[in-house]
Amino acid sequence: MKQGSLSYNESAGQPWSSPYRWVMLAMLWLLYAFFGLAFRSISPLITPILADLDMSYSQMGLVLGSWQLTYIGASTVAGFFIDKWGIRRSLFLGTLIIALSVGLRYFANGFDTFLPLVALFGIGGPMISIGCPKTIALWFQGKDRGTAVGIYTTGQFFGGALALIATNRAIMPLTSYSWRLTFAFYGILTLLVACLWWVLAKDLRSSVLSEQTQMKGILTTLLKVPNIRMVLVCGLLTFAIIHGLTSWLPRILEEQAFAPTLAGYASSIPLLAGIPSLLILPRFIASERRGLALGVLAMLSASSVWLILFLTGFLMFVGLILYGIAACTLVPLLTLILMETPEVGARHMGTAGGLFFCVSEIGGFLGPLLVGMLVDWTGGFLAGGSFVVALSLGILLMSFFVKK
């Protein structure tokens, strides 16, 4: 460990027995909360951005999926660098890049400048979404690991819900309804969180847990494992579902006669509904039942999308709640399956996590883009919603291939 880097001395005991692991978990939660706030912050601002920058739905769909595209490239090497640099420096750098991506959107003057600023998020994002499970794998074991995965994952949904609720209700009025100043405000907050992480986070001082094999050899070995291949396919479909629907959800609700503020409130329902399930399900679903749970959640996700698109009133809100419970739990469930695959473990979780998010974000990119294109072609969101339902049924099919 380089001089000046904070580290946990393993001679004092195993990290999973140290009380400081809960401080690390709290900091991971905070980073993931601002990760969620950053990428959800565009959705409630789609209407003023479309008007101000004179963009089409297809262009906005490309913008919404652009950071996933850069994420794909960055995540191929992010896991390797996290293992090399340590989690403290890696996650600080990732959060700093996210802060720049959000804050610099203030200067966008059209599609050509807005697109790369949003895409920049995908450079920093992998450090967070890959670094968090890597940290959990190092600092937690047993049932505590499932609990920790559930807890830190709620951060993203809390941050996303905060963006959807507060943007039009509180932040836009404070900034004289300037979407530019709103992004600048969120960027400054994210920068402050990055500095807090730098002060409090600790690296593990360990040569045993670091990657000792060449990256190419590790990837080849991992891809030969059937469970890992299944997780990769399900991850791709899951991210297409989550980003494809939730990125457009405020606009979908606005087209159903919701006011922008009310659409933001309603769009936060899936995120808030997902928080209890994230705290409960990852801990209590036994490893041998995760395949069954994956299939059930996929069916619930498909059903909920139909309720959201085709019904109104109470049943539509039931659909929003059901979607949050089902879709929000898919990623931590897949993460646990990956993390506890014997060929992965804590040793290779950085590389395996990079591979998972690299493949998954292909779906994260294509989901919003294809939904936006279907809106331009058909004039409504029903075709895009049917596409999301089909993806959920694909996960149901793949769940039969999860090995106990």
Give the positions of each predicted feature.
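Juxtamembrane intracellular "pre-TM" segments in multi-pass secondary transporters
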Residues: Y8-S18, K202-V231
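Residue-level signature of mid-helix packing/kink "hotspots" within the transmembrane helices
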Residues: R40, Q68-T76, A161, L271-L279, ...
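Extracytoplasmic gate region of multi-pass secondary transporters
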Residues: I42-P44, N227-L278
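Conserved MFS/SLC helix-loop-helix module at the cytosolic interface between two early adjacent transmembrane helices
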Residues: G73-G110
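Cytoplasmic helix-loop-helix junction between adjacent transmembrane helices
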Residues: L117-G155
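Helix-loop-helix hairpin linking two adjacent transmembrane segments in secondary transporters
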Residues: I151-A201
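C-terminal transmembrane helical hairpin of 12-TM major facilitator-type secondary transporters
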Residues: R289-I337
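A late C-terminal transmembrane helix in Major Facilitator Superfamily
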Residues: V344-G380
